[in-house]
UniProtKB/Swiss-Prot annotation:
Residues that bear Phosphothreonine: 5
Spans traversing the lipid bilayer: 76-99
Keyword Lyase part of the UniProt annotation: no
Induction remark: Expression induced by concanavalin-A stimulation. Induced during cell activation but is subsequently maintained at constant levels throughout the cell cycle in exponentially growing cells.
Name used for this protein in its record: Amino acid transporter heavy chain SLC3A2
GO molecular function term, any single one: protein homodimerization activity
Gene that encodes the chain: Slc3a2
Length: 526
């Protein structure tokens, strides 16, 4: 048998063994070669073994089972557990609400309570002698905005001929400084930056007596009432009067002017200034008029020790009671004119963290001094950059200018901005309680706290050598205590600030460098 015959026989056997693989419609001759179109049919092995399907309980059977004692008891048990759990959660919520400490009601806050005030007594010295006066001030509003100040105390800028009351017009702007339209534009621009304008209306600011002669008091009062109404209609947010100690019947006039100011809106501010550092005289002025801010030389009457500064602050707060305070070292001068250079950073920290409104003069954020060579002592030029002070015969150091300090993270300007930002957003610093801590004569330390908000600890070293602070908390009220450690937010020592910022410092033996102030933060603990 040939090889071809054997292949054919195998095909026949496969076709006989697997008929299901044959094409259903193939011709006889093509059946052997067709490989597609095959159909496989699976036949159940045993159709007779199909089981009976379970259709579940009928309605009658289900009701019978559900009504059995076992299921009834189960349902009642589950229902009882549900309601007991619900009542337990309700009771727990009530207990939490009842036992939780009550939040203190927030005090009424006006805009001058929420940040610092910035004084520009000499407009041309601030913007530059040839910078356009009031119009030039508009270009510096962005800079003031970065300082986070809430109000700008401007002037005096009204027409005043030295010691001539008839040539003094409190309603008109000195034409060398700008026009009424320039001032209205300034008001609108400042409003967009959320900066309020307070106008200084000290009448005879270029003369010997700021309020003219005592016999002319009635004439001054009449002019003042007319001017107040006029400027309020223009949109001014408040007024400042300096040297009120030289004004006859000052309490009477201040009360009258306050009524005029408040009649238009409660959101208007009145500021009085005095060169006096006598606490009783200051209190007498404050008691004459409600909601009055008073700037004075009270804090400059210091021997610059921690003990002396603490005494001044606590006596002032005790004497003024619940009345809102303001803090400055003078009614118009620069901080550096009254405070030594090595304490400027310390006093910035102090003024921003005491309860009340801090008041600064232009240049205080830089450490500007009034006695620089080539500058008038009462009105130093604002050092925007090296070329802006062309009257000085020698170059100005870069770190004395706004430009230079802007670029220095350890500068006095940077510290001012950080403190101003904290002062404006932290409730404990905005309107929190104040408690002085016992410490050594070289230190002044205190706590600011409000309800359940973050608390702040301020420690100031007035000594020219390092100190370890042992803080006594025995005089703190119930519910207030010092923690074992606190987070360092700010140090007036720029080297330490960059090295230890946001680190936790132990308070048991807190170490301070010479003339260093620390601002520390710790949380409320129920």
């Amino acid at each position: 048998m040939s090889q071809d015959t054997e292949v054919d026989m195998k095909d026949v056997e496969l076709n006989e063994l697997e008929p299901e693989k044959q094409p259903m419609n193939a011709a006889d001759g093509a059946a052997a070669g067709e490989k597609n179109g095959l159909v496989k049919i699976k036949v159940a092995e045993d159709e007779t073994e199909a089981g009976v399907k379970f259709t579940g309980l009928s309605k009658e059977e289900l009701l019978k089972v559900a009504g059995s004692p076992g299921w009834v008891r189960t349902r009642w048990a589950l229902l009882l557990l549900f309601w007991l759990g619900w009542l337990g959660m309700l009771a727990g919520a009530v207990v939490i609400i009842v036992r939780a400490p009550r939040c203190r009601e927030l005090p009424v806050q006006r805009w001058w309570h929420k940040g610092a005030l910035y004084r520009i007594g000499d407009l041309q010295a601030f913007v530059g002698r040839d910078a356009g006066g009031i119009a030039g001030l508009k270009s510096h509003l962005e800079y003031l905005s970065t300082l986070k100040v809430k109000g700008l105390v401007l002037g005096p800028i009204h027409k005043n001929q030295k010691d001539e009351i008839n040539e003094t017009d409190l309603k008109q702007i000195n034409p060398t400084l700008g026009s009424q339209e320039d001032f209205k534009d300034l008001l609108q621009s400042a409003k967009k930056k959320s900066i309020h304008i307070i106008l200084d209306l000290t009448p005879n600011y270029q003369g010997q007596n700021a309020w003219f002669l005592p016999a002319q008091a009635d004439i001054v009062a009449t002019k003042m009432k007319e001017a107040l109404s006029s400027w309020l209609q223009d949109g001014v947010d408040g007024f400042q009067f300096r040297d009120v100690g030289k004004l006859m019947n000052a309490p009477l006039y201040l009360a009258e002017w306050q009524n005029i100011t408040k009649n238009l809106s409660e959101d208007r501010l009145l500021i009085a200034g005095t060169e006096s550092s006598d606490l009783q005289q200051i209190v007498n002025i404050l008691e004459s008029t409600s909601d009055l801010l008073l700037t004075s030389s009270y804090l400059s009457n210091s021997t610059f020790t921690g003990e002396r500064t603490e005494s001044l602050v606590t006596r002032f707060l005790n004497a003024t009671g619940s009345q809102w305070c303001s803090w400055s070292v003078s009614q118009a001068g620069l901080l550096a004119d009254f405070i030594p250079d090595h304490l400027l950073r310390l006093y910035q920290l102090l003024l921003f963290t005491l309860p009340g409104t801090p008041v600064f003069s232009y240049g205080d954020e830089l450490g500007l001094q009034g006695a620089l060579p080539g500058q008038p002592a009462k009105a130093p030029l604002m050092p925007w950059n090296e070329s802006s002070i062309f009257h000085i015969p020698r170059p100005v150091s870069l770190n004395m200018t706004v430009k230079g300090q802007n670029e220095d993270p350890g500068s006095l300007l940077t510290q001012f901005r950080r403190l101003s930002d904290l002062r404006g957003k932290e409730r404990s610093l905005l309107h929190g309680d104040f408690h002085a801590l016992s410490s050594s004569p070289d230190l002044f330390s205190y706590i600011r706290h409000w309800d359940q908000n973050e608390r702040y600890l301020v420690v100031l070293n007035f000594r020219d050598s390092g100190r370890s602070a042992r803080l006594g908390a025995s005089n703190l009220p119930a519910g207030i205590s010092l923690p074992a450690s606190a987070k360092l937010l700010l140090s007036t020592d720029s080297a330490r600030q960059s090295r230890e910022e946001d680190t936790s410092l132990k308070l048991e033996n807190l170490s301070l460098n010479p003339y260093e102030g620390l601002l520390l933060q710790f949380p409320f603990v129920a």
